[in-house]
Amino acid sequence: RVQFGKTLAEFQATQFKLADMAVRIEASRLLAYRAAAALGKGRATREAAMAKLFASESANKVVYDALQIHGGNGYVREFPVERYFRDARVTEIYEGTSEAQRMVISRELLK
């Protein structure tokens, strides 16, 4: 998209958004790998809950930011971000809500 004669990628705010999105995606991936490694050792309750909580909330934040960058096109079915926006929301609900994951994490920390 072009705004005020510049592409959105030229704006510092967009660059910061993209950087934050990349950090969230990478951190989510690393938490998932850590949970998988813990599962291999027979102890993954806390790690899995942390990965699920962070990744699902990050998915929603990243998709929301992507939607903002795309503007009106983010709501058009021809662009994948519209589908991601709908799909990301359910990640905080299935296999345990964010609140349930927080309960699991705190229970494990207090052991």
Descriptions of predicted regions:
Residues 1-111:
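Alpha-helical interface subdomain recognition
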